[in-house]
Amino acid sequence: MMTCPSVPAIPTLWLFSILLLVVSLNAQNKSWDNPICTEGILSVPRGNPAVMTCNISNTFTDVTIQLSANGKDKTIFDKKPQGNFSWRGWELQVQGGQAQLVIKDTQDDHTGIYLWQLHGRQRCYKNITLNILEPSNEDKVPDTTLFTSFPDHAKSSPIEGKPGTLVGVITVIFILGVAGFITFIYYRHRRS
């Protein structure tokens, strides 16, 4: 009668542990977008510029902006990639992980809720409400450049924007420790 040699359990468990480690570390290399946008309600005097921004920690794939006002939804920019775009008084600049919507001369038809659909590594939705106020004489701003320079992401900390990294590393170490402990117990049990 012929018997097949059995596959030792220890190398199998170690291979499984290494595979688990590789998969876990690969998952940790993908950072979340962590969107930061103009918050809540933006109130601007009629005729003045309005600037709304959304920034993510990764590069934008595309940006869609819709305006909801008076019970109607209107798409202003649909799935715009990197670049500068203009349409009926709205200007959109998408550069890296930063998007900026500028209205140079705000009017009543600009009032409403702006739904930002951000697409980087994930999809995220943000609402910004724009209210138009009656201007006073001192509210009028002289015409200046509205686009601000964007900060360089290369100078920011590599840990910034990745709060889950430490939790992921601790989880991987814990799983490997448990796998090692189970392997040790199994090995001792088989030898006794």
Curated annotation (Swiss-Prot):
Chain ranges on the Extracellular side, renumbered to this chain = 28-165
| GO MF annotation list | cytokine activity
What keywords does the record list, in alphabetical order? Answer: Cell membrane, Glycoprotein, Membrane, Secreted, Signal, Transmembrane, Transmembrane helix
Would the keyword Transmembrane helix turn up in this protein's UniProt record? yes
**Listed transmembrane segments:** 166-186
| Ranges of the Cytoplasmic topological domain | 187-192
Q: Which InterPro entries match?
A: Ig-like_dom_sf, Ig-like_fold, SECTM1
| Record has Nucleotidyltransferase as a keyword | no
In which compartments does the protein localize?
A: Cell membrane; Secreted
Q: Which PANTHER family match?
A: SECRETED AND TRANSMEMBRANE PROTEIN 1 (PTHR15123), SECRETED AND TRANSMEMBRANE PROTEIN 1A (PTHR15123:SF6)
Protein name per UniProt: Secreted and transmembrane protein 1A
